[in-house]
């Protein structure tokens, strides 16, 4: 069953049936103000932090997709009313027609009902801390119509804990007031004129308004049947205390064929509502702001465009996967309909991996995130697993947060720095390839010399920070020489404690290879020798202790008692995705062992929906292995199709030269390919999800937790750099694809260091891998394509064979 389709010309997903089996969401905002919005206009807004600066309320996991950012319409002649989005009024789909278009940082809602055509476009203008609701109402009947429009948002008390729990204070610490054309919401305890005020404004002069939620909705009612809309007029309520909303009402008389256009503006900051209300009364300014959002993403998407025989790959890579990856870089794991805003801060490993995918499209944000992570590293070399970057930003050290009487105090400086017992063994290592990729993309080699403080005092160059990360992993090894698992590795539920993690040793080896290449480029011969020797020791330990001869794969690790995890002798958790894919991705495994390991992955872990994380799933609790054994079978880390490491398998297969297998794995996970089986998938077909129920669960194939997952960044990185094979380097651009053998070729347009490269890949011999020749602007070249002049257009032809 399908509910919509991809409109690639407009980079939109079009939902033709609003009764999808779950909220399908989108992200509005590219800077500080963000709205998470569903296809039915449910969702919430926040400024910078959904934990501390929530603008509108959200009730997570509610039976219905409520509340939201709604516009109600009422036929004042008949008393009939509906909403432009299907919810919350939910008119019969036999009587009303709805269409929703999720675009890149905007969403469009359209409704045709009883001779009235209505559209609502939601977006956050660049440079503003506000959300625009651009509304058009048209009379398509042959009669004069009198139509009233009502807005509705429910304001939040700002801090999630107070908003959701401490009502004995929050109900009495805020109030609404009416100003000409707007409802102003005052967080009275907060003396800051910016963060202490929210508003909802309109470009029209309202006929009535409500600032009190319960006056607008009425007693024993909800958003589906608000009293004010039913009666055709708000009660002009505004006062201190209790629950607050923003509803502005206006009646319009429309001749046949006539349309009216106006806007609502939801935002933050005292006085900003008046300013933006006046500004957007000129609809040309609305059009210009929307055009700027379109241009923002046109510019980013243009950095890498592909035309291949695989339409699903083209659709996702040319827009949606980059969009999701950058959403994760900007908003981390802050806010979705699953992560509902109670955790402000950066997950160390999450952010380091997210950032590797977008240095070409957003180098400024990539650099910022890398600096954030380096400031969150301690002198010993490990990273703080979860931290607020503001803690260590020298420009924000003296900025005291507004103190609410209803919140838990912020942690002391000592509490911000955790010790070894709370350290995840993989966090810091992801930094190495990400920093290298950033410099390869931008050419900013001086970045390695920039001095950046450690979280626990002192400072060092970026290059020395990288060495500290590598040295930490070399020091914290077990008796076999394999890296200790510490609190956990990438798999948070694999709590090895004093045990050892094969995944981290493979990751350590990959980071070492990247660093050795960097040291060679910088001419640091002593470091080349030191870390080459370190890498050799890692390889020897891994090949000696981690290969399972009977199974023909790499084990997952060892418990603190020395018992192996992931052997052919075991009944549960025999084969694991992370260890086998990273053994190959890192370059540690030989061709022979790599092929055996990935054959085992294909045999034991593959499904039509992607690769399982492990199999068979654990059914018996074993605390030596960790919490993973106490997760339901086929769910999350225990035998689900955990999406994030799936792209590691795509990369691994390209390293082995097996393009057909790489594409088989890619196609299985690609949400585009599940667009017509939504009754199985449930989640959005334009977004990767955290996990898909595994074969040991009754809902096998159901996708869970869309948007905020490192899968998107890794999917983009794996396809662009390894399957399509277009990689930036310190000295040039390389093109070395690994594609399905039946592809005749493909085209890529790639912008790199200010020049554009139009790359034509030809595959006359139908091979998967192997470059026979490269020409640059008609001249044969060997190896990498050197940087060309800024602003130049260059023709590259690559022949495989």
From Swiss-Prot:
Sites binding N-acetyl-D-glucosamine sit at: 492, 636-637
InterPro entries, alphabetically?
A: 6-hairpin_glycosidase_sf, 6hp_glycosidase-like_sf, Carb-bd_put_dom, Gal_mutarotase_sf_dom, GH36_catalytic, GH94_Enzymes, GH94N_ChBP, Glyco_hydro_65_N_sf
Catalysed reaction(s)?
A: N,N'-diacetylchitobiose + phosphate = N-acetyl-alpha-D-glucosamine 1-phosphate + N-acetyl-D-glucosamine
Q: Which GO terms describe its biological process?
A: carbohydrate metabolic process
Please indicate if the UniProt record lists Iron as a keyword: no
Alphabetically ordered keywords of this record: Carbohydrate metabolism, Glycosyltransferase, Transferase
Query: For binding N-acetyl-alpha-D-glucosamine 1-phosphate, which residues are annotated in this chain's numbering?
Result: 333, 343, 349-350, 490, 492, 637, 644, 690, 709-710
Q: How does activity depend on pH?
A: Optimum pH is 7.0-7.7.
Q: Which domain of life is it from?
A: Bacteria
Write the Enzyme Commission number(s) for this entry: 2.4.1.280
- Which GO terms label this protein's molecular function in UniProt? carbohydrate binding; glycosyltransferase activity
Q: In this record, what's one Pfam family?
A: Glyco_transf_36
The entry describes the temperature dependence as follows: Optimum temperature is 30 degrees Celsius.
Catalytic residues at 492 (proton donor)
Similarity section? Belongs to the glycosyl hydrolase 94 family.
Purpose of the protein? Catalyzes the reversible phosphorolysis of chitobiose (N,N'-diacetylchitobiose or (GlcNAc)(2)) into N-acetyl-alpha-D-glucosamine 1-phosphate (GlcNAc-1-P) and N-acetyl-D-glucosamine (GlcNAc) with inversion of the anomeric configuration. In the synthetic reaction, is also active on glucose-1-phosphate with 10% activity as compared with that on GlcNAc-1-P. GlcNAc is the best acceptor substrate, but the enzyme can use aryl-beta-glycosides of GlcNAc as the acceptor substrate with 10-20% activities of GlcNAc. Shows no phosphorolytic activity on cellobiose.
Q: What does UniProt say about this protein's domains?
A: Contains an N-terminal beta-sandwich domain and an (alpha/alpha)(6) barrel catalytic domain.
Complexes and interactors: Homodimer.
Query: What is the name attached to this protein's record?
Result: N,N'-diacetylchitobiose phosphorylase
Native source species: Vibrio proteolyticus
Q: Please name the gene that encodes this protein.
A: chbP
